[in-house]
């Protein structure tokens, strides 16, 4: 059972009565076959549900209105099987507030060269029916996606599946509640921002709860529940001697388990799926939540440190998008550099809170080590290296008049040496196109020091996300050159200023 099981995507066929009842019967038969086959064979994350043909303005408007009010409907996939005059779609598309994709396909893959006639031509008109539909989308300035390809094509399946992930993520984001335990780290700029503007743009709400409210729940956890969770720790991780039974830091592990259970109960009771903490506001907690946060991220919660609600929300959004995909997604921070004559590297980490979904197959180490900030007891944490391979880091920032999403494509590499004195999980990567260009572009564009790191998602996923939410996207990849990058920032400033 995943979040995608809570949603469905409606499959809508556009046509008209011009071609007669027999043509419409064939259209319906084709649609049923296509939808049944896609549900059975395409490995789509969501179920497709075939809706009645849209052949009149009233029928189309009714479908769009129903989609808006059906909480299970994540979006509409439209196939223009025949020509469907686009003025019929205006009223429906005007009110539609769910994601929209045109599947530009046709029932037959190959033309029947020897038998093709005008009946066949009239029945299979995606080639120009889709263009008519595309015009009205452009004329109405309506955000929509297009996937071209035969309905049996695996690449088309993957692209539709990727769009479905975006559609479900958008619906989930509309209901997302972000809990901030305490406020921002004092005097930090990029983690602040306009929470009202964010709720208007994305739909998620952000509110602050006193750490004392959390502490009450943490203190209510029973010893039996703590013991059961620590047993899970024992089977899942390699505990250091200090963290084992009779170890000098065993109580710190028990305290971490209590915090994890209390945080999870608090989040569940409040309906929160993302949260932040700050080491400057820990009154009543015995340690900075480290292990608790790592394990909650692994369960799908969004998180960021120091009150960074934008990154916490983005992490939750990206975790929903990547559910079921290979590779993990985590809170991350660019921490320090390794300069090496063109083989420059970034070491990413945080004080404690890196998600185990990005770890290698080796069991993480559970250890308790001192933490120089926060003024609390030594916190428990998981220590691991990350998987290697292509990845991205993404940052969502508030520019005052708009939100900007920055994405840098990276290559995660093996750590060339052991790090015996570094008691935190970490990732090592090469920024693309190179560290100098990537870091300068990131800084010029205002990217945060906190990011969401993902092996599961790629640049195309984040581009779709930005388009679906109508926000600015700034890309740093192997094609990035600083002069043209700076030009693009200037053009974006003019473009988005004109839309105020």
From Swiss-Prot:
Q: Do you know which Pfam families this protein is assigned to?
A: AraA_central, AraA_N, Arabinose_Iso_C
Alphabetized, the UniProt keywords read: Arabinose catabolism, Carbohydrate metabolism, Isomerase, Manganese, Metal-binding
Q: What GO biological process terms are annotated to this protein in UniProt?
A: L-arabinose catabolic process to xylulose 5-phosphate
Task: Supply the name of the protein.
Answer: L-arabinose isomerase
Q: Which sites bind Mn(2+)?
A: 306, 333, 350, 450
Q: Does the keyword Manganese apply?
A: yes
Please explain the role this protein plays, according to its UniProt record.
Catalyzes the conversion of L-arabinose to L-ribulose.
Q: Which reaction does it catalyse?
A: beta-L-arabinopyranose = L-ribulose
The species this protein was found in: Klebsiella pneumoniae (strain 342)
Give me the comment on cofactor binding: Binds 1 Mn(2+) ion per subunit.
A Gene Ontology molecular function term of the record: manganese ion binding
Q: In which pathway does it act?
A: Carbohydrate degradation; L-arabinose degradation via L-ribulose; D-xylulose 5-phosphate from L-arabinose (bacterial route): step 1/3
- The answer to whether UniProt assigns keyword Isomerase to this entry is yes
State the EC number(s): 5.3.1.4
- What cellular component terms from Gene Ontology apply here? cytosol
The SS bond pairs are none
Its top-level enzyme class, in one word, is isomerase
Hey, which family's this protein in?
A: Belongs to the arabinose isomerase family.
Q: How does it assemble?
A: Homohexamer.
Give the protein's cofactors. Mn(2+)
């Amino acid at each position: 059972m995943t979040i995608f099981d809570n949603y469905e995507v409606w499959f809508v066929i556009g046509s008209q009565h011009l071609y007669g009842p027999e043509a419409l019967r064939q259209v319906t038969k084709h649609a049923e076959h296509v939808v049944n086959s896609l549900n059975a064979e395409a490995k789509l994350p969501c179920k497709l549900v075939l809706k009645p043909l849209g052949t009149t303005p009233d029928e189309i408007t009714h479908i769009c209105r129903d989609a808006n009010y059906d909480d299970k409907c994540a979006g509409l996939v439209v196939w223009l099987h025949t020509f469907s005059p686009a003025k019929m779609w205006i009223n429906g598309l005007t009110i539609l507030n769910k994601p929209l994709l045109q599947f530009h396909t046709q029932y037959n893959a190959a033309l029947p060269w020897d038998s093709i006639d005008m009946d066949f031509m009239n029945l299979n008109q995606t080639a120009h029916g889709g263009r008519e539909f595309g015009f009205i989308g452009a004329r109405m300035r309506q955000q929509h996606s297009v996937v071209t390809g035969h309905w049996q094509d695996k690449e088309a399946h993957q692209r539709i599946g990727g769009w479905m992930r975006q559609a479900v993520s958008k619906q989930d984001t509309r209901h997302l509640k972000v809990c901030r335990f305490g406020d921002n780290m004092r005097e930090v700029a990029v983690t602040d921002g306009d929470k009202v503007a964010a709720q208007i743009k994305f739909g998620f709400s952000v509110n602050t709860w006193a750490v004392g409210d959390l502490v009450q729940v943490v203190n209510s956890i029973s010893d039996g529940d703590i013991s059961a969770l620590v047993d899970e720790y024992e089977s899942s991780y390699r505990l250091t001697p200090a963290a084992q039974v009779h170890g000098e830091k065993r109580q710190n592990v028990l305290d971490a388990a209590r915090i994890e259970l209390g945080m999870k109960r608090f989040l569940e009771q409040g309906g929160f799926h993302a949260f932040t903490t700050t080491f400057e506001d820990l009154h009543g907690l015995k340690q900075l939540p480290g292990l608790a946060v790592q394990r909650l991220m692994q369960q799908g919660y969004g998180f960021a440190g120091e009150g960074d609600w934008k990154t916490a929300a983005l992490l939750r959004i990206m975790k929903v998008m990547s559910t079921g995909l290979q590779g993990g997604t985590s809170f991350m921070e660019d921490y320090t550099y390794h300069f090496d004559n063109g083989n420059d590297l970034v070491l990413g980490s945080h004080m404690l809170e890196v998600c185990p979904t990005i770890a290698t197959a080796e069991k993480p180490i559970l250890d308790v080590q001192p933490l120089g900030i926060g003024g609390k007891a030594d916190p428990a944490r998981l220590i691991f290296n990350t998987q290697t391979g292509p990845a991205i880091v993404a940052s969502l920032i508030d520019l005052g008049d708009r939100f900007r999403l920055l994405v840098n494509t990276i290559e995660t590499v093996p750590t060339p040496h052991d790090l015996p004195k570094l008691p935190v999980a970490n990732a090592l990567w090469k920024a693309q196109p190179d560290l100098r260009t990537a870091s300068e572009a990131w800084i010029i564009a205002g990217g945060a020091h906190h990011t969401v790191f993902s092996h599961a998602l790629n640049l195309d996923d984040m581009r779709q996300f930005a388009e679906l939410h109508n926000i600015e996207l700034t890309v740093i990849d192997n094609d990035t050159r600083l002069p043209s990058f700076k030009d693009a920032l200037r053009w974006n400033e003019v473009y988005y200023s004109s839309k105020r």
